[in-house]
Amino acid sequence: TTKPVPSGSPWYGPDRVKNRELEVIHSR
């Protein structure tokens, strides 16, 4: 799920959760 979000803008809704999951995966 990718949306055109301006740089510096926080993620909102499910997209933010998905982004968090991706961060966790990359953190491994």
Swiss-Prot record:
GO CC entries: chloroplast thylakoid membrane; photosystem I; photosystem II
GO molecular function ontology, one term from the record: chlorophyll binding
Predominant location category: plastid
Binding site for chlorophyll a 2: H26
Domain of life: Eukaryota
Residues that hold chlorophyll a 1 according to the record: E23
Region (Disordered) residue spans: 1-28
Biased composition (Basic and acidic residues): 15-28
Keywords: Chlorophyll, Chloroplast, Chromophore, Magnesium, Membrane, Metal-binding, Phosphoprotein, Photosynthesis, Photosystem I, Photosystem II, Plastid, Thylakoid, Transmembrane
Subcellular location: Plastid, Chloroplast thylakoid membrane
Cofactor annotation comment: Binds at least 14 chlorophylls (8 Chl-a and 6 Chl-b) and carotenoids such as lutein and neoxanthin.
Residues reported in the UniProt entry to bind chlorophyll b: R28
Membrane topology: Multi-pass membrane protein
GO annotation, biological process: photosynthesis
Primary role: The light-harvesting complex (LHC) functions as a light receptor, it captures and delivers excitation energy to photosystems with which it is closely associated.
Free-text note on domains in this protein's UniProt record: The N-terminus of the protein extends into the stroma where it is involved with adhesion of granal membranes and post-translational modifications; both are believed to mediate the distribution of excitation energy between photosystems I and II.
Complex formation: The LHC complex consists of chlorophyll a-b binding proteins.
Family: Belongs to the light-harvesting chlorophyll a/b-binding (LHC) protein family.
Name listed for the protein in its UniProt record: Chlorophyll a-b binding protein 3, chloroplastic
Species name: Populus euphratica
